[in-house]
Regions:
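Short helix-loop-beta connector
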Residues: 36-39
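N-terminal Rossmann-like FAD-binding beta1-loop-alpha1 element of flavoenzymes
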Residues: 41-67
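Conserved N-terminal/central alpha/beta ligand/cofactor-binding core
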Residues: 1-24, 29, 70-198
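Short, hydrophobic/aliphatic alpha-helical segments
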Residues: 33-34, 63-75
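Generic recognition of flexible, low-complexity loop/linker segments
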Residues: 31-32, 54
Length: 198
């Protein structure tokens, strides 16, 4: 627990070994019956890459979602500026990549300032994130045989960066946007453009 002045900051990180923290927490949570999901309304503030993906995914799970957007359209989010790629521990080139290696490289790249349990969770689900992006239609670069291409990037020792040439952020945002708009069309998400939140 950190302290700023006299106010404690609690990250709400579960207890236990780092590899089991979030899995144990997920297994302890109560389930919401599919019949009851429409009783809950989820508010998503921001429709950039994270917000649009979250709103679309929650709607696909059966929740009613209200998505608030500061701009006219989610396509104007600053997520579009990302260029390099997205890292995932899929070990396609068989060069010894693993969740632990991605975890270590990420913590080290963040100058050991990140919350390690959260970074481990990110490394654990990184492969699923790439799969979700592909399912949303993100045109990642591919090898001649059709497999997703990846490269080394930054301080990584292995090839784990999935990319869409120099437009990774744009393509990821367009994939999330198309999923979000599909859910808006189906009535699962209510878009609130040009809104500010306090």
């Amino acid at each position: 627990m950190f302290k700023v002045a006299d106010a404690p900051l609690d990250g709400r990180v579960p207890d236990g070994p780092i590899a089991d923290k979030w899995d144990n927490r997920k297994n302890e949570l109560k389930l919401v019956s599919p019949n009851n999901k429409r009783k809950y309304e989820v508010i998503v503030v921001g429709t950039g890459l994270a917000g649009a993906s979250a709103a679309a995914s929650l709607s696909e799970m059966g929740y009613k979602v209200k998505a608030f957007c500061f701009q006219d359209s989610p396509r104007r989010a600053h997520s579009i500026a990302a260029q390099g790629g997205i890292n995932a521990a899929k070990n396609y080139p068989n060069d010894g990549d693993s969740i632990w290696r991605l975890f270590y490289d990420t913590v080290k790249g963040g100058d050991f300032r990140a919350r390690e349990a959260n970074v481990f969770r990110l490394a654990s689900v990184s492969g699923s994130i790439i799969d979700q992006c592909v399912a949303q239609g993100v045109p990642f670069a591919r090898e001649y045989g059709g497999l997703l291409s990846n490269r080394t990037f930054g301080g990584a020792q292995v090839s784990r960066t999935f990319y869409a040439r120099g437009q990774t952020g744009q393509q990821l945002l367009l994939g999330a946007y198309s999923s979000l708009m599909r859910q808006v069309g189906e009535g699962g998400v209510t878009m609130m453009p040009r809104r500010e939140m306090l």
